[in-house]
UniProtKB/Swiss-Prot annotation:
Organism, as annotated: Epstein-Barr virus (strain B95-8)
Name the UniProt record assigns to this protein: Small capsomere-interacting protein
Keyword annotations of the record: Capsid protein, Host nucleus, Virion
Localization per record: Virion; Host nucleus
Pfam family, one: Herpes_capsid
The encoding gene: SCP
Amino acid sequence: MARRLPKPTLQGRLEADFPDSPLLPKFQELNQNNLPNDVFREAQRSYLVFLTSQFCYEEYVQRTFGVPRRQRAIDKRQRASVAGAGAHAHLGGSSATPVQQAQAAASAGTGALASSAPSTAVAQSATPSVSSSISSLRAATSGATAAASAAAAVDTGSGGGGQPHDTAPRGARKKQ
C-alpha cells in the first residue's frame, strides 16, 4: 500500500508558498495605495487568479502552436510585406495602374526595409549562397520600387488594361 504524502502547509501568500513562481514579479506590482486591507486582499486574490489563467493560456498557446501567437502574427506580417515586394518585382504588368503599383511598391518597400534590419545579423551568419540570395532579393525589391516610381512619373494614361478607379463616395452607387 502506498503511503500518502502529507499535504503542504500553505500560508496563503504567493511569495511564501511559491517563492520560485514566475508570477511573483507581476503579482508584486499590485499596490495597495489607499485601499482598505480586506478590499486589497480580495483584489490580490482576483489578480492572482487572472495571472494564473493568463500564464496557463500562454503555455497552452506555446505548446499548441510552437511560438506565442503574437510573435506568429508579427512574423506573418513581415513575410507578407516581403512577399508583396517580391511579387511586385516579378510582375511586369498588372491590372493596377502605374500610380497604384508605385504606391503599393513604396508601401511594401518600407515594410521590407523595416523587416530587413533584423535580418542583417542572420544574413551575416548565413552561408554565402543564402546571403547572396538575400542580397539579390533586396536588390530586386529596391529595383521594383525604382521601376514603379519611374513608371508613375512617365504615366501616359494608357492604364495598363486595369479597371477605372471609382471616385464616388461610398454610399453613392446604386446597389444592383
